[in-house]
Amino acid sequence: MERDFLGAIGRKEEAAGKPEEHSDYRGGGGGASAAMQWQFPATKVGAASSAFMSFRSSAAAAREEDPKEAAVFDRFSLSGFRPPPRPSPGDAFDGAAAMKQRQFGFNGRQQYAAAAQHGHREQGVDSYGVAAPHHFPSPSPSPRHPVPFGHANPMLRVHSLPNVAGGSPYRNQSFSVGNSVAGSTVGVYGGPRDLQNPKVTQMTIFYDGLVNVFDNIPVEKAQELMLLASRASIPSPPSAARKSDSPISAAAKLTVPEALPARQIVVQKPEASVPLVSGVSNPITIVSQAVTLPKSSSSSNDSAGPKSGGLPLAVTPLSQASPSQPIPVATTNASAIMPRAVPQARKASLARFLEKRKERVSSVAPYPSSKSPLESSDTIGSPSTPSKSSCTDITPSTNNCEDSLCLGQPRNISFSSQEPPSTKLQI
């Protein structure tokens, strides 16, 4: 039935003629009113075609006759767009072309641009032709989404309302891929929102097997703490060790003023006197060293005499030292400080040992011999033979009771308790 109607329209076009057709186009372009009569009788097909009638150019109507191009046109069309029909009298279009014009695709932009040149601007066609490139973006990848959307996406459809005042078409807000408002923010750094995170910082300190976490620690405070920790990790100089021994040195100075060099010897080796005192390998050598000690140092403290054996080889024996050589003061002071380093139990055992040795010496030789001290020192060197002049040697190093016992016996050398003994041992 379409073919018969198409043929009827073709015959009436030939009868109308081309000048009349051009005059109709000029009348339509002159802004004619919408109340115009349709010159063809209203049939079923004609009524259906007139409802969807739109403006077309002659070149577009010629291309509609090609079936291949029409198939491509229908394939890429958007069915949502319905342009308002504004027919003009004497406009000779075929009904089949009007049925196919219900939808328009990418060719529609060219058709409406051509129709806009003929003066059909009051129906919003020109505005759509200008805005069409924005609604149909090119398939070039956008900076945020590398995969473009398809052109047949329903989000890209543009709908028009023919009843809007002013005759301008109504277009929905389409979704644009590169829109800055509705664009995706995946992978985009949000600067203002993340600027507050560096202010809330935490500091973790591992100390003494504990983990300490502190909040809101600025960078300057953390650097200051690390600087203090680095200073504390440096080993202390040797002067700190000397300061720690200051109470001991003060006590030693109260007892003996010259005790500073002797104190260092005692602190370094406090246990050196234990094996030498307990051993009885050379007791006479120890006693022979005590001969040159002054009387005041031995009588000032009762226990100074027995503890004088704590210095094993600090003083040379009488056989090696000259008669006029005095003993250093540090050695005498060390003998006075030595009881402080020895415990009380060892002090008692040492006192018992010295008493028994004194009894053995007095029982072997109760009377002193007339030999010189130099000759007696030769016999002192041998541990097997006891010395006969041991009473003279032991007397200064013992306590007061020993002095009274030995002073009652006849001696060649006499010591006075009021004056220090002389270093000359000649008769």
Curated annotation (Swiss-Prot):
Biased composition (Basic and acidic residues): 1-25
InterPro entries: CCT_CS, TIFY/JAZ, Tify_dom
Keyword Transcription: yes
Keywords: Jasmonic acid signaling pathway, Nucleus, Transcription, Transcription regulation, Ubl conjugation
Domain of life: Eukaryota
Keyword Transcription in record: yes
Pfam family, one: tify
Residue ranges of domain Tify in the record: 196-231
Compartments it resides in: Nucleus
PTM notes: Ubiquitinated.
GO biological process, one term: regulation of jasmonic acid mediated signaling pathway
A single GO cellular-component term on record: nucleus
UniProt motif Nuclear localization signal: location: 345-352
Cited function: Repressor of jasmonate responses.
Free-text comment about domains: The jas domain (343-367) is required for interaction with COI1.
Entry-linked PANTHER family: PROTEIN TIFY 4A-RELATED-RELATED, PROTEIN TIFY 7
Family: Belongs to the TIFY/JAZ family.
Protein name (Swiss-Prot/TrEMBL): Protein TIFY 6a
Organism, as annotated: Oryza sativa subsp. indica
Organism phylogeny: Eukaryota, Viridiplantae, Streptophyta, Embryophyta, Tracheophyta
